[in-house]
Swiss-Prot record:
Cofactor note: Binds 1 Mg(2+) ion per subunit.
Cofactor dependence: Mg(2+)
Protein name: Adenylosuccinate synthetase
Domain of life: Eukaryota
EC number annotated for this UniProt entry: 6.3.4.4
């Protein structure tokens, strides 16, 4: 059976820390979607490991790790990340596998990603992408012109000729769209001829890989990237990523049926953050937002960009839960709220004076909503490193209890500090 870790807000909730905790007792860790446009750090002992595309289960020497079909792979970044982990002493090559059906991200995808973003920014319609080529790659995938891993690693000489033809067709279409941008396709092709041999040992039929693991009753952890509110279908479109970041992406990205899912863990930051453009109803463009940003060290791992900050939004979380069906929650960074005398939580939206029954899909409406807040007294004491739920201040427990009651989902873990072991588990 599979347990799944998913982001419930706009990303950066701290999924990696929960995955790190759960990785100690699993046999397989799988990434199902996204690319190297996300990132987190795992600390083992005194060593920090940075993950962007590769599964976090690599830190467990007994765990096999899969980059699934729904992931898009920038091969140079794949090897750079792997080599960085190995340089820090992690022996993981024999435990890392890549789906033959995953699509490839090329340098021209990254180049066109930045050109498109610059084009949009002139009209003040920038999405705020990471520039990693993720969107353009999913675009070629959807238009059925993309190139998959098996196209690259197939040892048949005809396959390499087919790869080059597909590649040049994609390059030429981008040149027609954007002109003669600074790019050397011959140089990239020469690199990929070498990657063809280097990547081949990692490649597997991921559907067969997953179903063999399930049949063998292996403990499987699926590591979601990004978060529900960035989902291509259910997020704040068009200010979203280009993949299915919810529970649906787990199934389609790994080729597994719904009945194989056991637990869905929703990771919830104790307040709300967002990177890049897009609506953010509870954003605090004031001292509150600045304090959350400073105390919470809210800067992106992948881009280094400052994260926008605001109060917890339970309207967003209720919507997120309705789609992903969380079996329990991990509330992260509760300690960031330690010094607030008063804490607010968004509990409803009003539009034109009327309370909305659900999260609005139209951004014009979303930009006009009035957030209804509930106020809580803060606990104004340091909770860093607390290991038992009962040892939390009463006001902190009241805050958490309200979240549970509102969402009707139990809280199983609470983050009480940045350290690896600053996570308490609550009986549910």
């Amino acid at each position: 059976m599979c347990d799944v870790v998913l982001g419930s807000q706009w990303g950066d909730e701290g999924k990696g820390k929960l995955v790190d905790l759960l990785c100690d007792d699993i046999d397989v860790c799988a990434r199902c979607q996204g690319g190297n446009n996300a990132g987190h750090t795992i600390v083992v002992g005194k060593v920090k490991y940075d993950f962007h595309m590769l599964p976090s289960g690599l830190v467990n020497p007994k765990c096999q790790n899969l980059v699934g079909s729904g992931v898009v792979i920038h091969v140079p970044s794949f090897f750079a990340e792997l080599e960085n982990l190995e340089a820090k002493g992690l022996d993981c090559r024999d435990r890392l596998f890549v789906s033959s059906r995953a699509h490839l991200v090329f340098d021209f995808h990254q180049r066109t990603d930045k050109l498109k973003e610059a084009e949009l920014s002139t009209n003040k319609k920038s999405i705020g992408t990471t520039g990693k080529g993720i969107g353009p790659t999913y675009s070629t995938k959807a238009s059925r012109s993309g190139i998959r891993v098996h196209h690259l690693v197939n040892p048949d000489p005809e396959a390499w000729e087919d790869f080059k033809t597909r590649y040049m067709r994609l390059v030429e279409s981008r040149q027609k769209r954007y002109g003669e941008f600074e790019y050397d396709p011959k140089e990239e092709l020469a690199r990929f001829e070498k990657y063809r041999e280097a990547l081949r040992p990692f490649v597997v039929d991921s559907v067969n890989f997953m179903h063999e693991a399930i049949a063998a009753n292996k403990k499987i952890l699926v590591e979601g990237a990004n978060a529900l509110m960035l989902d291509i279908d259910f997020g704040t479109y068009p200010y979203v990523t280009s993949s299915s970041t919810g529970i649906g992406g787990v199934l389609t990205g790994l080729g597994i049926p719904p009945r194989t899912i056991r637990n869905v863990y929703g990771v919830v930051k104790a307040y709300t953050t967002r990177v890049g453009e897009g609506p953010f109803p509870t954003e605090q463009l004031n001292k509150v937002g600045e304090t959350l940003q400073d105390v919470g060290a809210e800067y992106g791992v992948t881009t280094g960009r400052k994260r926008r900050c605001g109060w917890l939004d339970l309207v967003v979380l209720k919507y997120s839960n309705s789609i992903n069906g969380y079996t329990s929650l991990n509330i992260t960074k509760l300690d960031v709220l330690d010094k607030f005398k008063e804490i607010e939580v968004g509990v409803a939206y009003k539009l034109n004076g009327k309370e909305l029954p659900s999260f609005p899909e139209d951004l014009i409406d979303l930009a006009k909503v009035e957030v209804v807040y509930k106020k809580f007294p803060g606990w104004e004491q340091d909770i860093t490193g607390i290991k038992k739920y009962d040892d939390l201040p009463e006001n902190a427990k009241n805050y958490l209890k309200f979240i549970e009651d509102y969402l009707q989902v139990p809280i199983q873990w609470v983050g009480t500090g940045p350290a690896r072991d600053s996570m308490l588990e609550k009986k549910i």
